[in-house]
From Swiss-Prot:
Protein origin, superkingdom: Eukaryota
Subunit text: Associated with the spliceosome.
UniProt entry keywords in alphabetical sequence: mRNA processing, mRNA splicing, Nucleus, Spliceosome
GO MF: pre-mRNA 3'-splice site binding
Sequence ranges of Basic and acidic residues compositional bias: 49-58
PANTHER family, per database record: PRE-MRNA-SPLICING FACTOR SLU7 (PTHR12942:SF2), STEP II SPLICING FACTOR SLU7 (PTHR12942)
A Pfam family annotated for this UniProt entry: Slu7
InterPro entries for this protein: Slu7_dom (IPR021715), Splicing_factor_SLU7 (IPR039974)
Protein's name according to its UniProt entry: Pre-mRNA-splicing factor SLU7
Region feature Disordered, mapped onto this chain: 28-58
């Protein structure tokens, strides 16, 4: 088969279409002549990534050293006019920046900020906003709490008391000889301190009460004891009435509400103080009886202060007191003879 030879202006039908058609980004290069390409290479390249930022089509080749192109100095004759220049002013002088250019940049930045603030103010402009804020203030809420749907307890910000010592610190130094012993239950994960509580019949750890709670428990216990005594008297009087008949119908005492802590708490507090005073008086009386029985002196005997081996506690020159035990008119001396001379002997007659 003879080889196909296309005529002038005729395309070869055997060449695919994607080869015949040139891409759009190569059409300008292909259609230009070699002279035009050489001229373009001297001024600009075909693909300039910073073409949208250039005021002119000229591209500056930064690979060539061009230091000092922005320097524009003022001269008086042949002497350059020097000013008090800072780092920024020297940098602007080297790159050729002027103050007017910086002012234009600042103006553009401020205009953009103002436009953003104005847009945000329009978005937040709501007639019900003030009423909504007042309602939140009345409810002691904040916008952040409403967004997160969480209201923090103000007690969470309180500092822990320094005397609040955790149980695990006691557990570090605890041993059978210590007064404070921690028993840790791994099942319930509770540290049980015998000094702070006890285990009840249900194997539950009950803390010991302190302060007002302890006083209330003592009052309740005392009221219960008084009520039990009164109940015994009522039962005994009732039995006597049943046994002896109705000779004394009014001898059975009625329920006494003054013995109830809930009915009369103030009266119970006064009774507890009265019982405490009586108990204290009995203990003092019994102690006095014992002292009288064994002929013991109730007054405490004066005990001499113990002497130490220091020089301050040693007596010299038959003195009964040390030098410095007496002071008068700005002078120190001996208390026994009231002499101010340190080397003098004691002249006291006692």
């Amino acid at each position: 088969m003879p080889k196909y030879q296309p005529k002038n202006g005729e395309l070869n039908p055997y060449i695919p279409r994607y080869i015949l058609e040139t891409p759009r980004y190569q059409q300008d290069i292909i259609n230009k002549s070699p002279e035009q390409e050489d001229a373009q290479d001297q001024t600009t390249t075909a693909h300039d990534p910073l073409a949208h930022q250039r005021k002119t089509g000229e591209i500056i080749d930064n690979s060539i050293a061009q230091s000092g192109t922005g320097i524009k100095d003022e001269f008086k004759g042949t002497i350059r006019v020097e000013e008090n220049e800072s780092y920024d002013s020297k940098r602007d002088r080297w790159y050729g920046y002027s103050t007017e250019e910086w002012l234009t940049h600042l103006k553009n930045w401020n205009d953009k900020k103002q436009s953003r603030k104005h847009a945000s103010a329009q978005d937040n402009d709501d007639s019900d906003d003030t009423d909504y804020e007042l309602e939140l203030i009345e409810l002691e809420l904040d916008k952040k709490d409403m967004k997160k749907n969480i209201k923090k307890d103000p007690m969470e910000k309180m500092l822990r008391d320094r005397q609040d010592i955790p149980a695990y610190i006691y557990n570090i130094t605890s041993n059978p000889n210590n007064k404070i012993r921690i028993e840790y239950d791994p099942k319930s994960r509770l540290a049980k301190d015998s000094a702070k509580g006890f285990l009840n019949k249900r194997n539950q750890f009950v803390k010991k009460l302190t302060g007002d709670g302890d006083e209330l428990m003592k009052l309740q216990k005392m009221a219960q004891e008084l009520d039990n005594e009164h109940e015994k008297d009522r039962k005994l009087a009732k039995l006597k009435q049943e046994f002896y008949g109705e000779e004394n119908p009014k001898t059975v005492p009625q329920t006494d509400l003054s013995l109830s802590l809930e009915a009369s708490p103030t009266l119970m507090m006064l009774k507890s103080k009265q019982l405490q005073n009586e108990k204290l008086a009995k203990s003092i009386q019994s102690k006095q009886e014992v002292m009288e029985k064994y002929n013991a002196s109730t007054e405490s005997d004066e005990k001499e202060s113990k002497k130490t081996g220091h020089l301050e506690d040693k007596l010299f020159l038959n003195h009964k007191y040390i030098y410095g035990s007496y002071y008068e008119n700005g002078k120190w001396g001996y208390k026994c003879c009231k002499q101010f001379d340190k080397n003098s002997r004691c002249t006291a007659t006692d």
